[in-house]
């Protein structure tokens, strides 16, 4: 099944980082039979987090670790391309059992699971909920707190960003 857990935030108990560790432990635990290196296990779902033009893999590409030894690992991406990473390139990868709503933009999944908890109060906004829900083609599973859901639905205020873009463009014209 094409399923993805999305979280509004990286931190907190229901954030990307903590949930990735929890799901790795539950779905693909470290065992004597399962090769492991630098916190990654053979079979882990991983995401490339920076562009690498020499390897032709880009920020947001998701794959699965298919081989590990003491100095390198191989990730198979969805287009059946195998990419080898040496130990000094491991920082270009992160677990992808869970990803942020922001990282999921532009992607679609059959099923999306979205934890909504009050600890994410700063990110509980209607537009973020809309983005997460519209990543799902068939099914959305909301897990958590009804109050957090109601907060997100009723909060249509987005943070105002001060980029100075207009001023910078005016200077160039």
Language-model-derived ranges and their functions:
Residues 61-173:
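C-terminal accessory regions
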Residues 1-59:
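Conserved helicase/translocase motor-coupling segment
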